[in-house]
């Protein structure tokens, strides 16, 4: 059973805090503005890579073998990431640097800073594919702004594959939880999700789903039979609920 969250922050409602946050990083020397864009100086955070194990020097070395884009040429280092991007398309916000939008790494950090004491949460979750660069960049900003990591513990779940292929819109093999629940029922869906460790990938195939349906059916039948036995033998509820 999932309860509704106490808070449902929106980026559009956090823009004043985002602008102040970015300006604070500029004032501290952790960020710089170039042609209306604002970038974070990754090399100033010695703890960078503490989550993913990635080394800054390896990132720099890797970038030396490829052609840099126009945006990358603006940066002091290829490892630096955008806190703010100037744009004349879509939703735009006014700032001291330009009309534009915040970088997605920054949005999350600022909303956490706004809602939680000292800008730190106990558990930060997300997909394994977000560990780097997204979560690593969140940590870097928190270290620069707060002087400590953004979370005490991290939980990264693996991906769901369909017949051995990554589930993605581009492949057209996306399965929605609501559709699986309608077709197979809540118990089958929950059993399927719990059939593997959250840090291991789940490969969904017709064979796997058939197997899960059989397992759930066995448990449901056993539960019904046990309940019927207790009722027939007049076992008081308070006795078998202990």
Residue ranges of each PLM-predicted region?
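Alpha-helical recognition segments enriched in aromatics with Gly/Pro capping
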Residues: 16-229
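Short, intrinsically disordered, charge-balanced linker/junction segments flanking boundaries
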Residues: 238-241
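Acidic carboxylate-rich catalytic motifs and surrounding loops in phosphoryl-/glycosyl-chemistry enzymes
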Residues: 7-13, 157
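N-terminal, positively charged nucleic-acid-binding surface of large information/translation enzymes
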Residues: 1-2
């Amino acid at each position: 059973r999932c309860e509704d969250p106490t808070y449902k922050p929106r980026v559009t409602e956090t823009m004043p805090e985002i602008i102040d946050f970015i300006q604070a990083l500029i004032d501290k020397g952790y960020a710089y503005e170039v042609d209306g864009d604002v970038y974070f100086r990754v090399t100033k955070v010695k703890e960078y890579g503490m989550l993913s194990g990635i080394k800054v020097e390896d990132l720099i070395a890797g970038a030396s073998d490829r052609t840099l884009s126009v945006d990358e040429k603006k940066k002091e280092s290829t490892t630096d990431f955008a806190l703010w991007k100037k744009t004349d398309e879509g939703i735009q916000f006014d700032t001291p640097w330009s009309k534009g939008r915040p970088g997605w790494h920054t949005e999350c950090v600022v909303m956490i800073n706004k809602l939680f004491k000292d800008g730190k949460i106990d558990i930060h979750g997300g997909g394994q594919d977000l560990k780097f660069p997204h979560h690593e960049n969140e940590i870097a900003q928190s270290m620069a702004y707060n002087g400590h990591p953004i979370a005490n513990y991290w939980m990264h779940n693996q991906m769901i594959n369909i017949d051995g292929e990554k589930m993605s819109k581009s492949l057209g093999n996306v399965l929605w939880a609501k559709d699986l629940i309608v077709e197979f029922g809540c118990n089958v869906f929950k059993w399927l999700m719990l059939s593997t460790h959250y840090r291991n990938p789940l490969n969904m195939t017709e064979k796997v789903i058939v197997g899960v349906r059989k397992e759930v059916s066995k448990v449901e039948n056993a539960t019904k039979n046990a309940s019927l036995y207790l009722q027939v033998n007049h076992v008081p509820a308070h006795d078998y609920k202990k």
